[in-house]
């Protein structure tokens, strides 16, 4: 889907601050469409003093977010710091349809109650990044519910099946004989109509959302509006350095995780992956990051830079004091020590199987995970590695460790 530019007609001066705003906008992005239009929107905003309206649509299909989700949120915050207004759009209507983006099957819809509960949790966590004073929260049921059958049909008439089939996921499913429900064609139309209702100047999304974002741009033209620009952000690679960050893959860092856990996970990433994290997650100037690369090439230990990254992210979601304490505890553990503030857990049922003990102490989510850690030599009791899954632990108080970062002082009766 390509097109000619049809953005702001008037020319405004491209001042140094406007060019800086463009640089901030493009940092780490996958694609900015159409750059010349966005540049003129930025220039107009500076000349007139009217903030631009920047939209992020969210279908809250899960309640908790990880730092991979914050890649887009960080970009929004950077644009807020330039003086622009963010519209945090809750897709309570579109979530009842189910977004087909990137799917090879139909996505099950959610109830309004599930959506609202997830949305509240998501926004509470997103507020750790966004500036609430420059964030407008909207629900797309405000304009989608009143459409009714007549309005929905009129909207559907503005797009063809051929245009819909330009989407890769629809094409793949069609060629593979996998059913595509008619209601799935409505999803990108409804997301696009959100842009019309909000009169957005820019819409952000992941690379998998590009088609939907372009539909919004086309619909704005149909309704006589200046079309929004589009900025897509890459998907953050997970801790394993291979696949995108995902809870299902276990390669994620949750934004509500404890400071020590968050810090330790970030310190575990590879030196090469560190640079993507700096670009997409850090607010440090690119010039400073480039200087770090030069210093490492000249012999500086990459660990020093990784510490700065981990501290910055922990401080963002907790506090600077928590970040400093997490570094102290990390160094202590690296020397073979035990953190000072490990949780104390009281259990009963001695003698208790080691897998059950680990699960009941909340050191692992399941006994199968406990057994996996034992097999890999990742479980210690009072510093001694446990290698036998059949071990039963007698009554007493022990320091139990799983992996490098999970500790508990367990009293078993």
Curated annotation (Swiss-Prot):
**Which residues are ATP-binding?**
247
Listed as disulfide-bonded, the cysteine pairs are none
**Species in which this protein is naturally found:** Cupriavidus pinatubonensis (strain JMP 134 / LMG 1197)
Single GO biological process annotation from the record: tyrosyl-tRNA aminoacylation
User: Could you tell me what this protein is called?
Assistant: Tyrosine--tRNA ligase
Please name the gene that encodes this protein: tyrS
Query: What family is it from?
Result: Belongs to the class-I aminoacyl-tRNA synthetase family. TyrS type 2 subfamily.
Task: Supply the NCBIfam families for this chain.
Answer: tyrS
**Annotated Pfam families:** S4, tRNA-synt_1b
Alphabetized GO MF terms:
ATP binding; RNA binding; tyrosine-tRNA ligase activity
Please give the function described in this protein's UniProt entry: Catalyzes the attachment of tyrosine to tRNA(Tyr) in a two-step reaction: tyrosine is first activated by ATP to form Tyr-AMP and then transferred to the acceptor end of tRNA(Tyr).
Annotated EC: 6.1.1.1
């Amino acid at each position: 889907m390509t097109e000619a530019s049809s953005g702001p007609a008037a020319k405004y001066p491209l001042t140094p601050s406007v060019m800086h705003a463009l640089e901030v906008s493009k940092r780490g992005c996958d694609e900015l469409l159409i750059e010349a239009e966005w540049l003129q929107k930025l220039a107009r905003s500076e000349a007139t003093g009217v903030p631009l309206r920047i939209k992020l649509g969210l279908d809250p299909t899960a309640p908790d977010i990880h730092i991979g989700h914050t890649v887009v949120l960080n970009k929004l915050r950077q644009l807020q710091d330039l003086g622009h207004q963010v519209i945090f759009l809750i897709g309570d209507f579109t979530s009842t349809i189910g977004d087909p983006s990137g799917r090879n099957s139909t996505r099950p819809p959610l109830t309004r109650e599930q959506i609202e509960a997830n949305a509240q949790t998501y926004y509470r966590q997103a507020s750790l990044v966004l500036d609430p004073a420059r964030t407008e929260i909207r629900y797309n049921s405000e304009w989608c519910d009143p459409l009714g059958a007549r309005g929905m049909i009129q909207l559907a008439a503005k797009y063809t099946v051929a245009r819909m089939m330009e989407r890769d996921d629809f094409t793949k499913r069609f060629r593979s004989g996998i059913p595509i429900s008619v209601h799935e064609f409505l999803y990108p139309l409804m997301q696009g109509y959100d842009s019309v209702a909000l009169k957005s100047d820019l819409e952000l999304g992941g690379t998998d959302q590009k088609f939907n974002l372009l539909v919004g741009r086309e619909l704005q033209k149909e309704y006589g509006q200046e079309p929004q620009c589009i900025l897509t952000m890459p998907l953050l690679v997970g801790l394993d350095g291979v696949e995108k960050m995902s809870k299902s893959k276990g390669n994620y860092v949750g934004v509500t995780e404890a400071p020590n856990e968050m810090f330790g996970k970030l310190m575990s990433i590879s030196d090469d992956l560190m640079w993507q994290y700096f670009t997409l997650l850090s607010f440090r100037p690119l010039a400073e990051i480039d200087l770090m690369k030069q210093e490492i090439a000249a012999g500086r230990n990459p660990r020093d830079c990784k510490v700065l990254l981990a501290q910055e992210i922990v401080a963002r979601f907790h506090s600077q004091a928590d970040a400093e304490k997490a570094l102290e505890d990390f160094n202590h553990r690296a020397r073979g020590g035990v953190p000072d503030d490990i949780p104390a857990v009281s259990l009963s049922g001695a003698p208790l199987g080691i897998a059950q003990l680990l699960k009941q102490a909340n050191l692992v989510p399941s006994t199968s995970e406990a057994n996996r850690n034992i097999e890999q030599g990742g479980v210690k009791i009072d510093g001694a590695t446990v290698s036998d899954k059949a071990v039963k632990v007698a009554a007493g108080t022990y320091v139990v460790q799983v992996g490098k970062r999970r500790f508990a002082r367990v009293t078993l009766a």
